[in-house]
Each structure stands twice: as structure tokens, then as C-alpha cells.
Amino acid sequence: MMVAARVVMAAMVVLAYAAGVSAAADETADKKLPIEQLIGMHDLTTAVSIGNYYLKQESLVAIRNLLTRLGKEEKLGPDWNLRNPLWQRAEDMLSKRVMAKVAEDFSTLEWLRPQWEDLDSREFSAAELDVLLTHFQSEVGRKQAKIVDHTVSTQVIMTLAFSGKLKDIAGVQEERSRMQHIWNKEDDDMRFSIEDATNADGQRFAYSALGKKYFVTAILKLTGIISHRIDELALALPKEVNARADQVRPLLQEFKSGRG
């Protein structure tokens, strides 16, 4: 009898565990569409432009270090420098190829979506996601989504600036101008009057427990994920650039031949 009772109890434990797993799977499935829709309310174009600007800067630093090293190895002399047309061709070639890789690994944000979905799934219940989605689909909610996006981009650039990572180097003017233009437009778009009576719902949401929780999740945690990705890619750039050394050697030989 005792053996039978133990078997029954073990079976009940297994069934309870299976039911728990099934319920968790059902809840995850219920969250999937609201999370996708909620993420779709946001636009991280500005944060991407900031990352592109910094990664272009770091790619040029790595490329110029490589070209300098190759010049020393090949004994090309002082004329092999940033002003030389063949250097510029080599730099441009490498820059385009490296930044194409950056576009794949960062700018598309394909890497971010799974992490963002997982973050929202961990932080919010299905009921909370429904409330969030309803709010952000409203006019004032869409405005607050822009505020979140702008705050994320501001935190990303502040992280880079305060850590001394942004440098003033030649070759990043286009990326810097684009970043500044997008940032300024986003700054204008997200502004609204707090005296407008229609913003009462927005203020109630901002001060609510769920609103505060969302802003912390979306701003602090999302910023951390983006900043980590930027740092990770920046650290990998020298290796990525050095692996392409053979691609510019014909230009070094052309420089040698032209020098006579």
C-alpha cells in the first residue's frame, strides 16, 4: 500500500509540474503578439545613428592603425599617410566593407528584438502588456513612446560621451551630421505642453506603478543592452579590420611602384 501511495504521489507531482509548464507556455504564447505590437510602437532610429557614428569612428581608428602598421612593415616612408590618394582609397575600401558588417551586426536591430521580447516577457504579465499596449496606442501614449525613445538615445550618447569614447577625428562628419539632425528632430517631435488637459491620462500613466516600471525597463535596461552591444562591436573592430589586411596590399604595392 505504501508503495502504491508513493507511486500515486509521484504521478501527482509529475502532473502538477506538467500543468505548470503548460500554463507557463500558454502565458508566453499569450504575450507574444502584445509584445511584438508594443515593440513596434517604438522607433530607435536615433540610438542607431549614435551607434553608427561611434562605430564609424572606431572603425577609422582601427583602419588607420592598420595602414600605419603596414606602411612601416613595407617601409613606405613618410609619404604614406592620410593625405595620400592611395591611402585614402585603401581607407575607403576598408571602411565601406567594415561598416557593411556593422549594419548587419548593429544597425538593423535584428539582434535586439529577441532580447527586447525576452525582457518584456520577464518583466510584464499578459494583463500588464494589454494595459501598456492600450495606453501606447492612444495619442498621448504615442507621444510618451517618443519620449522613451528620445531618452534611450540620450542615455546612449551620454554613456559614450561621459566615458570619453567620442573623439573628434576626420571622416565621421557625415555620420555626425546625420546623428545631430535625427536627434534634433526627435527632440522636437517628443515635446508637448504639460498644461494640455488631454495629457492628464499621460501623467496618470507616468506616475502609476506600471508606468514607472515600464519607463525603468524601457529606458535603463534597454539602454544597457544597446550600450553593451555597441561596446562589444567596438572592441571587435580592430580584429575585423586586421583580418582584411590582404585586401589593401595591392594598393600598397601600387604606392611602392609609383614611388619608383
Stretches with model-predicted labels:
Residues E110, Q115-V216, L220:
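Extended amphipathic alpha-helical interaction segments
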Residues A18-D26:
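Boundary at the C-terminal end of the N-terminal hydrophobic targeting segment
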Residues T46-L55, S59, I63, D120, ...:
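Surface-exposed patches in mature extracellular/periplasmic domains of secreted proteins
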Residues A62, L66, R89, M93, ...:
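Charge-rich, solvent-exposed alpha-helical interaction surfaces
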Residues D30-W111:
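Early exported N-terminus immediately downstream of N-terminal targeting peptides
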Residues R204-G260:
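A cross-kingdom marker for long, charged
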Residues V8-Y17:
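Bacterial N-terminal signal peptides
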Residues M1-M9:
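Bacterial N-terminal signal peptides that target proteins for export
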